[in-house]
């Protein structure tokens, strides 16, 4: 059901949601439109809720909610879900940002991630970044609050000036943190897939158990030759492409494979490693890159 059978375009949908949220929380809060450019220069359209004199402004993005609305959900029900989301943050104490100007206090929370340079030109306009081959390294601060959960804050040039450090120091400290907190995992792609599918198979609510069992059996039966694609990531499988920045990582991969190898950035979470066994020509490599990134 829609409002009297009428379908709103996105801008009017957003205004209606803002109206519902504003009416619910009253004058003590302000509701603002907030657009955010994230990885691969994708722009997300959201709204934020801020209590007066607070430095917390939680955001909820409306793009997917509009698709749900377009598929038949009522705007009132969507507004209620948005309000429920914001209720989590009401009366939550401010994040402790008092130490953000103290580099020694915050550097243990620094991290890095690797992004595609050409797809993130807008994202890095107000960020500190370092070029790395055809990629870019960007930096963030992790925070964790018992009520809000985990989050990250991108490092900006203003923060770098406030800390009075150079980019080399930032890169060194952030990489050391990642190496300590997110250790390297290097495994064959087949073995990684087997683990992933077994995890799904063990989910008793999964309705495709037999299909998954068949896939696992097929993967397990692959020969050593067919297992020559490897994955470089970290143990959490989150932002694992940054492991190539860890000290000695690539030399250790070379020692493990006992040969030269090719690197194919698959996503921000992993790197595909292909040993140079003499059979990988330009056409084969291009096909692999297209397959990995498809």
Where is each model-derived feature located?
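Activation/maturation switch segments at domain boundaries
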Residues: 2-27, 242, 278-287, 294
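Generic, low-specificity signal for short hydrophobic/alpha-helical stretches with a mild N-terminal bias
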Residues: 3, 64, 156, 231-235, ...
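Generic amphipathic alpha-helical segments used as scaffolds and interaction surfaces in large
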Residues: 4, 8, 157-161, 165, ...
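Extended, low-hydrophobicity segments enriched in charged/polar residues
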Residues: 7-224
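A generic structural signal for short, non-catalytic loop/turn and secondary-structure boundary residues
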Residues: 40, 223-225, 256-257, 266
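Residues in well-ordered beta-strands of folded domains
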Residues: 48-50, 231-233, 274
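Long, contiguous, structured domain-core segments that constitute the functional module of a protein
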Residues: 211-241, 245-252
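C-terminal structured domains
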Residues: 235-294
């Amino acid at each position: 059901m829609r409002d009297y059978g009428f379908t709103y375009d996105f801008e009017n949908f957003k205004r209606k949601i803002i109206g519902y949220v504003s009416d619910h929380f009253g004058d003590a809060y302000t509701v603002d439109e907030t657009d955010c450019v994230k990885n691969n220069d994708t722009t997300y359209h959201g709204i934020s809720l801020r209590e007066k004199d607070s430095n917390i402004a939680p955001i909820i993005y409306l793009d997917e909610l509009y698709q749900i609305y377009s598929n038949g959900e009522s705007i009132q029900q969507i507004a209620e879900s948005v309000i429920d989301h914001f209720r989590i943050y009401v009366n939550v104490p401010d994040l402790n940002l008092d130490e953000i100007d103290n580099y020694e206090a915050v550097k243990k929370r620094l991290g890095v991630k690797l992004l595609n340079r050409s797809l993130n030109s807008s994202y890095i306009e107000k960020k500190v970044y370092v070029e790395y081959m055809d990629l870019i390294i960007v930096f963030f601060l992790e925070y964790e609050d018992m009520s809000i959960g985990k989050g990250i804050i991108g490092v900006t040039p203003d923060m770098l000036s406030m800390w009075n450090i150079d980019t080399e120091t930032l890169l060194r400290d952030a990489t050391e943190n990642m190496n300590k907190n997110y250790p390297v995992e290097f495994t064959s792609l087949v073995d990684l897939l087997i683990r992933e599918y077994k995890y799904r198979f063990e989910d008793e609510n999964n309705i495709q158990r037999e299909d998954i069992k068949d896939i696992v059996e097929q993967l397990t039966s692959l020969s050593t030759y067919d297992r020559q694609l490897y994955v470089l990531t970290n143990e959490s499988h989150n932002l694992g492409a940054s492991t190539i920045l860890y000290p000695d990582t690539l030399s250790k991969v070379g020692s493990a494979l006992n040969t030269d190898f090719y690197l194919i950035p698959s996503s921000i979470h992993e790197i595909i490693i292909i040993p140079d066994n003499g059979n990988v020509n330009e056409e084969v490599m291009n096909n692999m890159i297209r397959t990995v990134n498809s």
